[in-house]
Amino acid sequence: MKAVIFVVDGLGDRPDKNGNTPLKEAKTPVMDRMAKEGICGLMNSVDIGVRPGSDTAHLALLGYDPYTTYTGRGPFEACGVGVTVKPGDIAFRCNFSSVDENFIVTDRRAGRIENTSELEKELDGLKIDDVEIIFKESGGYRAALVLRGPGLSDKITDADPKKEGKKVKEIHPLDDSKEAKKTAEIVNKLLKIAYEKLDKHPVNEERRKQNLPVANMIVPRGVGQVPEIMQFTEKTGLKGACIAGTGLIKGIAKMVGLDVIDVEGCDGTPDSDFMAKACAIVETLENYDFILVNVKGADEAGHDGNYELKKQVIEKVDEMLDYITKNISKDEVYFVLSGDHSTPIEEMDHSADPLPVVLWGKSVRVDDVEKFDEFSTYKGGLNWIKGVHIMPILLDLMGLAKKYGA
Amino acid sequence: MKAVIFVVDGLGDRPDKNGNTPLKEAKTPVMDRMAKEGICGLMNSVDIGVRPGSDTAHLALLGYDPYTTYTGRGPFEACGVGVTVKPGDIAFRCNFSSVDENFIVTDRRAGRIENTSELEKELDGLKIDDVEIIFKESGGYRAALVLRGPGLSDKITDADPKKEGKKVKEIHPLDDSKEAKKTAEIVNKLLKIAYEKLDKHPVNEERRKQNLPVANMIVPRGVGQVPEIMQFTEKTGLKGACIAGTGLIKGIAKMVGLDVIDVEGCDGTPDSDFMAKACAIVETLENYDFILVNVKGADEAGHDGNYELKKQVIEKVDEMLDYITKNISKDEVYFVLSGDHSTPIEEMDHSADPLPVVLWGKSVRVDDVEKFDEFSTYKGGLNWIKGVHIMPILLDLMGLAKKYGA
C-alpha cells in the first residue's frame, strides 16, 4: 500500500451572508465522490482554535509535533533553498536591504534587486571566530543565512526594523546563556562585515550609477536552531517524496528527508501546471510509497479576498483529482484530501476554522457523507481530528503501525 | 467584534426514566433559535470524564489550563472577597468555629454568627516571624486568610476536622521542603494566637451571655499558592468584565483581571434579578469587549434534586436570552451559551456529563441542529470540545488569534 496526503493550501472558509463558501459552491464532483466513497471529518492541522502557519501545519500533517520540531521559519527556509543544514545550526531568513551609513533602512528589499549571486559570494564561507557562515541567496533580494559552530543558540532577537526609516536592529541575547550572548555577537559582527563588503561592491557601484537602491546590508529574521528531526523513512518505513511549489514547504520536506520532486510540465493535458502536478503525482507513485502534495492557489486567492478565484482554483484541483483517481488504484493507494489551514475570504489570512478532510482507500469505514465541504464532512466517521493524527491513521491502515503493548 | 460567554451554572443533566431532562423539557424558544442560527456541540469544561468544580470550569472557559493555574480554592475565594493577592501568597478559606479549651469543635460555623468584623480586626495585619497575616471576613462565619512572606509553600495539610466533636487538626507539611515546614509552623502558631485573641473577645463574651456559640477559633482549608496568571487583557487583547453572583466566580474573574460588575436591579422589566442581569449584560457590552456571565439557580436546583425548579430556572434564562439577543447585534457580538458542568437531579452534585454548547454570531458555520439540549447539540459542527477551546475559537473568529508559524 502507498499513501498520498494532498493539501489544498488555505482550503477552508467561513460562510458568506448566504451561507456559502468557495468550496461549498464550487463544482467538485470528484471531491464529492471521494467523500461518498471515503471516511470524512474535520481537521485542525495543529489544534482546535490554533491559527497555523503553513510550516507548522505541514509538519503536523507529516506526523511531527510542531511544538517540539518547529523552532522558527529560518531552518525550513534555509533547507528549502538548498542549504544542507545540520542539527544545532542557527538559521535565518534574510533580506538584502538598502541602508545609509548609519544603518537606517532606506529600502527593505533593495529595490527588489534580481540577481544577488555575486553578493552572496562575499558572505558565504566567511568565518567569524569559530563560527562558519553559510549564506545563500534564494532569488532576488531574499537569502538564507546559517551559522555553524560550537555553543550557539537561537535565543536572540532579530535585526529587522520592519519599517523603512528605522535602523537595522542590533541583535540581543534573549536569555543569560553564554551561547545566546556569543550568537548575538557573531551576528552583530557579521552585519558590520556585510556592510563593509557589500557597500562598495561593484554590483552596488553599478546600481548607484543607475540610480537603483543598493543591496548593501543583510537583515536576518525568523531565527531558529535546526532541530534534531527523525527522518521520515526511519519513522514510518516509507520512501517519501514531496511535490510542492513553495520553498517553505520544500524546506520542510527536505528537513524530514522527503525527496522534493520538481514539476516542470507534463503531457497529461495542456491545461496549466495543475495538470502537470497531477501527472507528476501519478508518476512519482511508481517509485515512492508516500507523497506529500501541496497545491497553492486557493490560499493566495483567500489572502487576496477573491472568492471567485478561490472557487475556480478548487474546481481546477477537482480536475487534478479526476486524473489522479482514474490513474491510481484504490486497492493500492490511500488518499487523504484536506488543507493545511483555512484562509477565509473575509479574513484574508489564515484562520483556525477546521478543514474538511476525507480519507479514501481500501477498507476505510465509509460513512454517510456525500459532499466534500465545511458543512457536510463534520458528520463523518473521522469526527474532529488533528493533523498529527493523519500519519498514524495511514500507517495503521497500511499495516505499518507499531503495536503499543503486547 | 465583542464576545459573551454565558454560563448557566449546572446546566446539563442525565435523562430521567422517561428520557427527559429539565433542559429538554423546558420551553426555550430562544435557546432553540440560537442553536438553529449557530454552531452547536458538546463541551466538557475541563475534560471528558472529569467532574469539575465551578472554579476549575470557569478558569478553563476563560482559556486558562486549570491544571497549571488552579492551585486550590483559597486563592480564588480570597480574591473574590476583595483581598489583593500576589503571586506566591498562600491563601485559605476559613470558617469561624466554636471550640472548647482542647480545640474540640463544638460548632463548625460558630452558630452561623452574622457579624465578625470586630473579630477580623484581631487577626488582620498580624505578623508571625517574617510572615504577614491578611485576614478578611466574607460575610458571617466565613473568611479568607492569606499568608504573605518569603519561603512559603501550599504543600501542607488543612485544619478542618470536617465534623463536630473532633479536634481542629494540627497542620503538617506534605513534603520535605523547608518552605512547607515553615508554612505549617506559621499556621499552627496563628491558630493558637487566634484562640487566645478570640476566646475572651468582648464579642464572644457577649455571645456567651446570650447562650450563643462563640466564634473563638478559625479553621482554614482549601489552601493554595496564588499562581502567576497572565492577565486576560494581556493574553487576549480584550477589555473584559464579569457578571456573576457568587464570590468564587468573582474571585476567578478578579484573579485574571476582569472587572467585576455588580448588578443591583435595572429597569428593563420588573421580573426578578434574572432580567436585571440581562440588562446589565447589554449595558456592559457598550464599554467592554468581553463578558463572562454566570447565572446560578439551575445548579442550586440540581444540588437540591429539584427537577421542576431547574426547569423553571432554565425558562427564566431563556427570557434573559430573549432580551439580550434582541438588544445586541449578531454582526457585532459572538455569543457562547453553555454551562460550567452538569448538576444532574439524580446525582444532586456536579457530574462530568458534557454540556450542550452553541456558538452564535457572524460567519460561524451554521449546522443542522435545531434544538438546544443534551440530545441534539452533539450532532452539531462543534463536535465535542473542551472548555479551553472556547476562547481560542472566539479569538480566531474575532481576528485576534496569533499565527503559529509562518
Curated annotation (Swiss-Prot), chains A, B:
- List the InterPro entries hit by this protein, alphabetically: Alkaline_phosphatase_core_sf, ApgAM_prokaryotes, Metalloenzyme, Pglycerate_mutase_ApgM
Q: Record's Pfam families?
A: Metalloenzyme, PhosphMutase
Catalysed reaction(s)?
(2R)-2-phosphoglycerate = (2R)-3-phosphoglycerate
Protein family according to the UniProt entry:
Belongs to the BPG-independent phosphoglycerate mutase family. A-PGAM subfamily.
What protein name is recorded for this chain? Answer: 2,3-bisphosphoglycerate-independent phosphoglycerate mutase
Q: What is its EC number?
A: 5.4.2.12
Q: What keywords would UniProt list here?
A: Glycolysis, Isomerase
Species of origin reads Methanococcus maripaludis (strain DSM 14266 / JCM 13030 / NBRC 101832 / S2 / LL)
